């Protein structure tokens, strides 16, 4: 399977890859997103093209029911990244105005962060943090780590 949530533009092709030593039986829960139930053998991959209709599509596995993934189809999506364990991430973008957004379990969380990407320098650091949820207690490090590792920041033209 893939990360918990991915945000893509309409028509984007996604590959579901099985890196486990056993098969998975993947399906999309609404049955309306163009993916019929099928066995994904170990080492195999299957392509899926995101619908043209924006929305959230949930994928499950009959073999391992606890596996869940969401594909959010968003027309403004430009890039998707996953943060490291420290919550840091990087990506290459053309100069322009963008909006940074975090997602968790297929839903947008926190506040959008407007960002202006300029021609130079090569690396531009954000000065404002992406607020993706309520502040955690300082002594609650385990929960905070788990929370941030599941967030998926998404860049979109805005």
Language-model-detected regions and their locations in the chain:
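Extracytoplasmic copper-binding redox domains, predominantly the cupredoxin/blue-copper superfamily
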Residues: 1-147, 151, 155-158
């Amino acid at each position: 399977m893939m990360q918990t949530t991915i945000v893509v533009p309409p028509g984007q092709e996604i590959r579901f890859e099985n890196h486990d030593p056993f098969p998975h039986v993947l399906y999309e829960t609404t049955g309306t997103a163009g993916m019929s139930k099928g066995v994904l053998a170990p080492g195999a991959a299957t392509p899926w093209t995101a619908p043209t209709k924006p929305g959230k599509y949930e994928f499950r596995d009959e073999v391992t029911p606890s596996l869940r993934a969401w594909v959010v189809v968003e027309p403004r999506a430009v890039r998707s990244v996953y943060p490291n364990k420290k919550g840091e991430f990087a990506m290459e973008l053309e100069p322009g105005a963008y909006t940074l957004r975090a997602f968790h379990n297929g839903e947008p969380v926190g506040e959008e962060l407007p960002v202006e990407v300029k021609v130079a320098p090569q690396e531009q650091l954000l000065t404002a943090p992406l607020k993706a949820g309520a502040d955690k207690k300082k002594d609650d490090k385990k929960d905070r780590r788990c929370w941030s590792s599941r967030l998926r920041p998404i860049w979109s033209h805005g």
